Amino acid sequence: FEGEEVFVEKTPFGVKAWVTIPPCGAVTLVPYKKKNVEQKAVSAEKTTDGIALENSQVRVKINKKGEVTSFVLKESGREFAADALNCFHFYKDVPRMFDAWDIDSNYREQELEGAFDVCTELVADGIEAVIKVTGKIGNSSYTQYIRLAKDSRRLEFDTTIDWKELHRLLKTSFPVAVYAENGINEMQFGYVMRPTHRSREYEKDRFEVCNHRYSALCDASHGAAVLNDCKYGISMNQNALELTLLRAAAAPEMRADNQVHHFTYAFTAWEGDFAGCDVVKQGYELNEKPRLVPGCVPTFSMASVKSGTVVLDTIKPALDRSGDLILRLYESKKAAGKAQILLNVDAKKAWLCDMLENKEQEIVIKDGMLELEFGAFQIQTIRLSIEEAMA
Protein backbone atom coordinates (compact mmCIF):
# COMPACT_ATOMS: atom_id res chain seq x y z
CA PHE A 1 0.00 0.00 0.00
CA GLU A 2 1.12 3.59 -0.67
CA GLY A 3 3.97 2.12 -2.72
CA GLU A 4 5.16 -0.08 0.15
CA GLU A 5 5.36 -3.84 -0.30
CA VAL A 6 3.64 -5.78 2.48
CA PHE A 7 4.00 -9.36 3.64
CA VAL A 8 1.21 -11.42 1.99
CA GLU A 9 0.69 -15.16 2.07
CA LYS A 10 -1.83 -17.69 0.86
CA THR A 11 -3.03 -19.94 3.67
CA PRO A 12 -5.71 -22.64 4.07
CA PHE A 13 -7.85 -19.85 5.56
CA GLY A 14 -7.44 -17.43 2.64
CA VAL A 15 -4.93 -14.71 1.80
CA LYS A 16 -3.39 -12.98 4.82
CA ALA A 17 -1.43 -9.73 4.83
CA TRP A 18 0.71 -8.11 7.52
CA VAL A 19 -0.33 -4.45 7.41
CA THR A 20 0.08 -1.53 9.81
CA ILE A 21 -3.25 0.31 10.03
CA PRO A 22 -3.12 3.84 11.49
CA PRO A 23 -5.32 4.58 14.55
CA CYS A 24 -8.98 5.17 13.63
CA GLY A 25 -7.98 5.00 9.99
CA ALA A 26 -7.62 2.95 6.83
CA VAL A 27 -5.16 1.79 4.19
CA THR A 28 -5.66 0.56 0.63
CA LEU A 29 -4.08 -2.65 -0.63
CA VAL A 30 -3.56 -3.33 -4.33
CA PRO A 31 -2.30 -6.54 -6.01
CA TYR A 32 1.43 -6.68 -6.59
CA LYS A 33 3.68 -9.42 -7.89
CA LYS A 34 6.11 -10.38 -5.20
CA LYS A 35 9.78 -10.25 -6.20
CA ASN A 36 11.57 -11.64 -3.17
CA VAL A 37 10.70 -14.66 -1.08
CA GLU A 38 10.87 -13.82 2.63
CA GLN A 39 11.77 -16.24 5.37
CA LYS A 40 8.95 -17.59 7.50
CA ALA A 41 7.96 -15.04 10.13
CA VAL A 42 6.67 -17.82 12.41
CA SER A 43 8.40 -21.19 12.39
CA ALA A 44 6.62 -24.40 13.35
CA GLU A 45 8.32 -27.72 14.00
CA LYS A 46 6.88 -31.09 14.93
CA THR A 47 8.54 -32.68 17.96
CA THR A 48 8.19 -35.98 19.79
CA ASP A 49 5.98 -34.25 22.38
CA GLY A 50 3.88 -32.10 20.04
CA ILE A 51 4.62 -28.92 18.08
CA ALA A 52 7.03 -26.03 18.78
CA LEU A 53 6.26 -22.50 17.53
CA GLU A 54 8.60 -19.52 17.43
CA ASN A 55 8.50 -15.94 16.16
CA SER A 56 10.53 -12.84 16.97
CA GLN A 57 8.88 -12.47 20.39
CA VAL A 58 8.11 -15.87 21.92
CA ARG A 59 8.88 -19.59 21.91
CA VAL A 60 5.87 -21.84 22.50
CA LYS A 61 5.56 -25.60 22.97
CA ILE A 62 2.20 -27.33 22.54
CA ASN A 63 1.65 -30.97 23.49
CA LYS A 64 -0.47 -33.58 21.73
CA LYS A 65 -3.53 -32.59 23.79
CA GLY A 66 -3.41 -28.99 22.56
CA GLU A 67 -2.08 -27.71 25.89
CA VAL A 68 0.70 -25.13 26.09
CA THR A 69 3.56 -26.66 28.08
CA SER A 70 5.96 -23.76 27.58
CA PHE A 71 5.58 -20.04 26.84
CA VAL A 72 8.90 -18.18 26.89
CA LEU A 73 9.44 -14.48 26.18
CA LYS A 74 12.61 -14.24 24.11
CA GLU A 75 13.58 -10.78 25.39
CA SER A 76 14.12 -12.15 28.91
CA GLY A 77 14.14 -15.93 28.50
CA ARG A 78 11.46 -16.10 31.20
CA GLU A 79 9.15 -19.12 31.32
CA PHE A 80 5.52 -18.16 32.00
CA ALA A 81 3.89 -21.61 32.10
CA ALA A 82 3.85 -22.94 35.67
CA ASP A 83 1.89 -25.95 34.40
CA ALA A 84 0.04 -26.78 31.20
CA LEU A 85 -1.83 -23.72 29.86
CA ASN A 86 -5.14 -24.06 28.01
CA CYS A 87 -6.06 -27.14 30.04
CA PHE A 88 -9.79 -27.94 29.87
CA HIS A 89 -11.61 -28.72 33.13
CA PHE A 90 -15.06 -30.30 32.96
CA TYR A 91 -17.39 -30.29 35.98
CA LYS A 92 -20.81 -31.43 37.10
CA ASP A 93 -22.82 -28.22 37.64
CA VAL A 94 -26.13 -28.45 39.53
CA PRO A 95 -26.79 -25.20 41.45
CA ARG A 96 -29.09 -25.30 44.46
CA MET A 97 -31.10 -22.38 43.03
CA PHE A 98 -31.31 -20.30 39.85
CA ASP A 99 -30.06 -22.93 37.43
CA ALA A 100 -28.99 -20.60 34.64
CA TRP A 101 -27.65 -17.89 36.95
CA ASP A 102 -25.66 -19.40 39.82
CA ILE A 103 -22.49 -21.44 40.02
CA ASP A 104 -22.09 -23.15 43.40
CA SER A 105 -18.65 -23.24 45.01
CA ASN A 106 -18.67 -27.03 45.35
CA TYR A 107 -18.32 -27.54 41.59
CA ARG A 108 -14.59 -28.15 42.11
CA GLU A 109 -15.43 -31.29 44.07
CA GLN A 110 -17.31 -32.71 41.07
CA GLU A 111 -14.74 -32.72 38.28
CA LEU A 112 -15.30 -35.15 35.43
CA GLU A 113 -13.04 -36.50 32.71
CA GLY A 114 -11.77 -33.69 30.51
CA ALA A 115 -10.86 -33.72 26.84
CA PHE A 116 -10.29 -37.10 25.17
CA ASP A 117 -9.69 -38.47 21.65
CA VAL A 118 -7.59 -35.36 21.02
CA CYS A 119 -5.69 -34.93 17.75
CA THR A 120 -3.33 -32.09 16.81
CA GLU A 121 -2.26 -31.09 13.31
CA LEU A 122 0.00 -28.34 11.98
CA VAL A 123 -1.95 -26.66 9.17
CA ALA A 124 -0.05 -23.42 8.45
CA ASP A 125 3.11 -21.46 9.16
CA GLY A 126 4.77 -18.38 7.71
CA ILE A 127 2.92 -15.12 8.42
CA GLU A 128 0.92 -17.02 11.04
CA ALA A 129 1.39 -20.50 12.49
CA VAL A 130 -1.83 -22.44 13.01
CA ILE A 131 -2.35 -25.72 14.85
CA LYS A 132 -5.67 -27.53 14.51
CA VAL A 133 -6.85 -29.41 17.59
CA THR A 134 -9.91 -31.68 17.56
CA GLY A 135 -11.33 -33.65 20.44
CA LYS A 136 -14.29 -34.57 22.60
CA ILE A 137 -15.52 -33.42 26.00
CA GLY A 138 -18.39 -35.40 27.50
CA ASN A 139 -20.99 -35.79 24.75
CA SER A 140 -19.64 -32.77 22.90
CA SER A 141 -16.98 -32.29 20.23
CA TYR A 142 -14.72 -29.33 19.59
CA THR A 143 -12.32 -27.90 17.04
CA GLN A 144 -9.72 -25.37 18.11
CA TYR A 145 -7.23 -23.42 16.01
CA ILE A 146 -4.22 -22.23 18.01
CA ARG A 147 -2.69 -19.21 16.26
CA LEU A 148 0.60 -17.33 16.66
CA ALA A 149 1.12 -14.40 14.29
CA LYS A 150 4.21 -12.59 13.09
CA ASP A 151 5.90 -10.42 15.77
CA SER A 152 3.09 -11.17 18.27
CA ARG A 153 3.16 -12.14 21.94
CA ARG A 154 -0.51 -13.13 21.80
CA LEU A 155 -1.34 -16.82 21.43
CA GLU A 156 -4.96 -17.15 20.27
CA PHE A 157 -7.36 -20.06 20.72
CA ASP A 158 -10.09 -19.87 18.06
CA THR A 159 -12.64 -22.39 19.33
CA THR A 160 -15.83 -24.04 18.07
CA ILE A 161 -17.75 -26.47 20.31
CA ASP A 162 -20.83 -28.50 19.43
CA TRP A 163 -22.22 -28.39 22.97
CA LYS A 164 -24.55 -31.29 23.89
CA GLU A 165 -24.40 -31.26 27.68
CA LEU A 166 -26.83 -30.88 30.57
CA HIS A 167 -25.77 -29.58 34.00
CA ARG A 168 -22.13 -29.31 33.00
CA LEU A 169 -19.50 -26.56 33.31
CA LEU A 170 -16.43 -26.14 31.10
CA LYS A 171 -13.40 -24.03 32.01
CA THR A 172 -9.93 -23.55 30.59
CA SER A 173 -7.03 -23.02 32.99
CA PHE A 174 -3.86 -20.94 32.66
CA PRO A 175 -1.52 -21.50 35.65
CA VAL A 176 1.25 -18.93 35.27
CA ALA A 177 4.65 -18.38 36.86
CA VAL A 178 3.57 -15.14 38.52
CA TYR A 179 3.01 -14.50 42.23
CA ALA A 180 0.15 -12.06 42.79
CA GLU A 181 -2.05 -11.60 45.87
CA ASN A 182 -4.58 -9.76 43.72
CA GLY A 183 -5.69 -10.24 40.15
CA ILE A 184 -6.77 -7.52 37.73
CA ASN A 185 -10.15 -7.81 35.99
CA GLU A 186 -11.09 -5.34 33.28
CA MET A 187 -14.42 -3.54 33.60
CA GLN A 188 -15.95 -0.61 31.71
CA PHE A 189 -13.29 2.09 31.32
CA GLY A 190 -10.82 0.62 33.81
CA TYR A 191 -10.30 -2.40 36.02
CA VAL A 192 -10.91 -3.75 39.51
CA MET A 193 -8.54 -5.77 41.67
CA ARG A 194 -9.73 -8.88 43.48
CA PRO A 195 -7.88 -11.37 45.71
CA THR A 196 -6.48 -14.59 44.28
CA HIS A 197 -6.61 -16.28 47.69
CA ARG A 198 -9.41 -17.33 50.05
CA SER A 199 -7.86 -16.25 53.36
CA ARG A 200 -10.85 -14.24 54.56
CA GLU A 201 -14.31 -15.68 54.98
CA TYR A 202 -16.06 -13.30 52.59
CA GLU A 203 -13.49 -14.02 49.87
CA LYS A 204 -14.64 -17.63 49.68
CA ASP A 205 -17.68 -16.37 47.78
CA ARG A 206 -15.45 -14.75 45.15
CA PHE A 207 -14.65 -18.05 43.47
CA GLU A 208 -16.19 -16.69 40.24
CA VAL A 209 -15.91 -13.03 39.22
CA CYS A 210 -16.58 -11.00 36.08
CA ASN A 211 -14.18 -9.55 33.56
CA HIS A 212 -14.44 -7.89 30.17
CA ARG A 213 -11.61 -8.14 27.63
CA TYR A 214 -8.83 -9.30 29.96
CA SER A 215 -7.83 -10.58 33.37
CA ALA A 216 -4.21 -10.37 34.51
CA LEU A 217 -1.82 -11.53 37.19
CA CYS A 218 1.34 -9.47 37.64
CA ASP A 219 4.04 -8.36 40.04
CA ALA A 220 6.46 -5.45 39.78
CA SER A 221 8.65 -7.21 37.19
CA HIS A 222 6.39 -9.21 34.87
CA GLY A 223 2.85 -10.38 34.24
CA ALA A 224 0.48 -12.48 32.16
CA ALA A 225 -3.13 -12.17 31.03
CA VAL A 226 -5.98 -14.15 29.55
CA LEU A 227 -7.96 -12.23 26.92
CA ASN A 228 -11.37 -13.08 25.51
CA ASP A 229 -13.93 -11.86 23.00
CA CYS A 230 -17.20 -12.89 24.69
CA LYS A 231 -16.64 -14.84 27.94
CA TYR A 232 -17.17 -12.79 31.08
CA GLY A 233 -16.84 -15.22 34.00
CA ILE A 234 -13.44 -16.15 35.41
CA SER A 235 -11.85 -17.70 38.51
CA MET A 236 -8.53 -16.53 39.93
CA ASN A 237 -7.12 -19.28 42.12
CA GLN A 238 -3.62 -18.57 43.44
CA ASN A 239 -1.52 -18.36 40.25
CA ALA A 240 -4.18 -19.74 37.87
CA LEU A 241 -6.58 -17.82 35.63
CA GLU A 242 -9.55 -20.09 34.84
CA LEU A 243 -11.89 -18.75 32.16
CA THR A 244 -15.46 -20.09 32.14
CA LEU A 245 -16.33 -21.15 28.60
CA LEU A 246 -19.72 -22.89 28.72
CA ARG A 247 -22.50 -24.04 31.03
CA ALA A 248 -25.56 -26.22 30.41
CA ALA A 249 -28.52 -25.14 32.55
CA ALA A 250 -31.83 -27.06 32.55
CA ALA A 251 -34.05 -24.08 33.43
CA PRO A 252 -35.81 -21.96 32.35
CA GLU A 253 -35.20 -23.84 29.06
CA MET A 254 -34.00 -27.44 29.15
CA ARG A 255 -31.66 -27.31 26.13
CA ALA A 256 -31.09 -23.60 25.62
CA ASP A 257 -27.29 -23.94 25.51
CA ASN A 258 -27.20 -27.02 23.28
CA GLN A 259 -25.90 -25.58 20.03
CA VAL A 260 -22.68 -24.80 18.22
CA HIS A 261 -20.69 -22.12 20.07
CA HIS A 262 -17.81 -20.14 18.59
CA PHE A 263 -15.48 -17.93 20.62
CA THR A 264 -11.86 -16.87 20.87
CA TYR A 265 -9.64 -16.39 23.88
CA ALA A 266 -5.92 -15.71 24.09
CA PHE A 267 -2.86 -15.68 26.33
CA THR A 268 -0.18 -13.01 26.48
CA ALA A 269 2.70 -12.04 28.77
CA TRP A 270 5.09 -9.14 29.28
CA GLU A 271 8.15 -7.90 31.13
CA GLY A 272 7.85 -4.84 33.36
CA ASP A 273 5.03 -3.46 35.48
CA PHE A 274 1.35 -3.41 34.56
CA ALA A 275 1.23 0.32 33.77
CA GLY A 276 3.79 -0.15 31.00
CA CYS A 277 2.31 -3.25 29.37
CA ASP A 278 0.11 -3.37 26.27
CA VAL A 279 -2.62 -5.70 27.56
CA VAL A 280 -5.38 -3.12 26.99
CA LYS A 281 -4.27 -2.72 23.37
CA GLN A 282 -4.13 -6.51 22.99
CA GLY A 283 -7.67 -6.80 24.33
CA TYR A 284 -8.95 -4.27 21.81
CA GLU A 285 -7.09 -5.99 18.95
CA LEU A 286 -8.67 -9.34 19.82
CA ASN A 287 -12.16 -7.85 19.93
CA GLU A 288 -12.03 -5.23 17.14
CA LYS A 289 -10.90 -6.91 13.96
CA PRO A 290 -10.08 -4.81 10.86
CA ARG A 291 -12.92 -4.48 8.36
CA LEU A 292 -12.28 -5.27 4.71
CA VAL A 293 -14.31 -3.37 2.10
CA PRO A 294 -13.77 -2.81 -1.64
CA GLY A 295 -12.56 0.64 -2.60
CA CYS A 296 -9.56 2.94 -2.72
CA VAL A 297 -8.68 5.77 -0.31
CA PRO A 298 -5.42 7.43 0.71
CA THR A 299 -3.96 6.25 4.00
CA PHE A 300 -5.47 8.32 6.80
CA SER A 301 -6.04 8.45 10.55
CA MET A 302 -8.98 10.41 11.93
CA ALA A 303 -7.51 10.79 15.42
CA SER A 304 -4.82 9.28 17.63
CA VAL A 305 -3.57 9.58 21.20
CA LYS A 306 -0.03 10.03 22.49
CA SER A 307 -0.15 8.42 25.92
CA GLY A 308 0.82 5.11 27.43
CA THR A 309 -2.43 4.65 29.31
CA VAL A 310 -5.16 6.87 27.80
CA VAL A 311 -7.46 5.13 25.31
CA LEU A 312 -9.62 6.72 22.62
CA ASP A 313 -12.63 4.43 22.95
CA THR A 314 -15.32 6.13 20.86
CA ILE A 315 -15.70 8.41 17.85
CA LYS A 316 -19.31 9.06 16.91
CA PRO A 317 -21.74 11.73 15.65
CA ALA A 318 -23.32 13.94 18.32
CA LEU A 319 -26.76 12.82 19.46
CA ASP A 320 -28.32 16.18 18.58
CA ARG A 321 -27.52 15.64 14.86
CA SER A 322 -25.66 18.94 14.71
CA GLY A 323 -22.83 17.48 12.66
CA ASP A 324 -20.43 17.69 15.61
CA LEU A 325 -18.16 14.77 16.46
CA ILE A 326 -17.90 13.20 19.91
CA LEU A 327 -14.66 11.67 21.18
CA ARG A 328 -14.69 9.67 24.40
CA LEU A 329 -11.42 8.83 26.11
CA TYR A 330 -10.47 7.19 29.38
CA GLU A 331 -7.40 6.48 31.48
CA SER A 332 -7.04 2.69 31.60
CA LYS A 333 -4.25 1.87 34.07
CA LYS A 334 -4.90 3.92 37.24
CA ALA A 335 -2.02 6.19 36.23
CA ALA A 336 -2.78 9.92 36.09
CA GLY A 337 -0.99 11.97 33.44
CA LYS A 338 -1.19 14.06 30.28
CA ALA A 339 -2.42 12.94 26.88
CA GLN A 340 -2.06 14.57 23.49
CA ILE A 341 -4.94 13.99 21.06
CA LEU A 342 -3.91 14.45 17.43
CA LEU A 343 -6.83 15.42 15.18
CA ASN A 344 -6.88 14.86 11.44
CA VAL A 345 -10.29 16.45 10.91
CA ASP A 346 -10.77 20.17 10.29
CA ALA A 347 -12.21 20.92 13.72
CA LYS A 348 -12.88 24.61 14.39
CA LYS A 349 -13.69 24.39 18.09
CA ALA A 350 -13.53 21.81 20.86
CA TRP A 351 -15.30 21.52 24.20
CA LEU A 352 -15.14 19.25 27.19
CA CYS A 353 -18.62 17.80 27.74
CA ASP A 354 -20.53 15.76 30.24
CA MET A 355 -21.59 12.22 29.35
CA LEU A 356 -24.82 13.61 27.85
CA GLU A 357 -22.70 15.67 25.42
CA ASN A 358 -23.60 19.04 26.96
CA LYS A 359 -20.80 21.59 26.53
CA GLU A 360 -18.97 22.50 29.74
CA GLN A 361 -15.62 24.08 28.87
CA GLU A 362 -13.99 25.16 25.60
CA ILE A 363 -10.50 23.80 25.04
CA VAL A 364 -7.82 25.11 22.68
CA ILE A 365 -6.88 23.29 19.48
CA LYS A 366 -3.23 24.07 18.73
CA ASP A 367 -1.61 22.77 15.54
CA GLY A 368 -4.33 20.15 15.21
CA MET A 369 -3.75 18.86 18.72
CA LEU A 370 -5.50 18.86 22.10
CA GLU A 371 -3.68 18.37 25.38
CA LEU A 372 -5.61 17.09 28.40
CA GLU A 373 -4.87 16.07 31.96
CA PHE A 374 -6.32 12.72 33.05
CA GLY A 375 -6.80 11.47 36.58
CA ALA A 376 -6.70 7.77 37.39
CA PHE A 377 -9.56 6.00 35.53
CA GLN A 378 -10.97 9.38 34.47
CA ILE A 379 -13.38 9.47 31.52
CA GLN A 380 -13.43 12.61 29.36
CA THR A 381 -15.79 13.46 26.51
CA ILE A 382 -14.79 15.95 23.81
CA ARG A 383 -17.13 17.65 21.36
CA LEU A 384 -15.66 18.85 18.06
CA SER A 385 -17.37 21.40 15.83
CA ILE A 386 -16.66 20.64 12.19
CA GLU A 387 -19.67 22.37 10.58
CA GLU A 388 -17.62 24.84 8.52
CA ALA A 389 -15.29 22.12 7.29
CA MET A 390 -18.22 20.00 6.16
CA ALA A 391 -19.97 22.95 4.51
Name these PLM-found stretches:
Residues F1-A391:
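C-terminal (or distal) subdomains of carbohydrate-active enzymes
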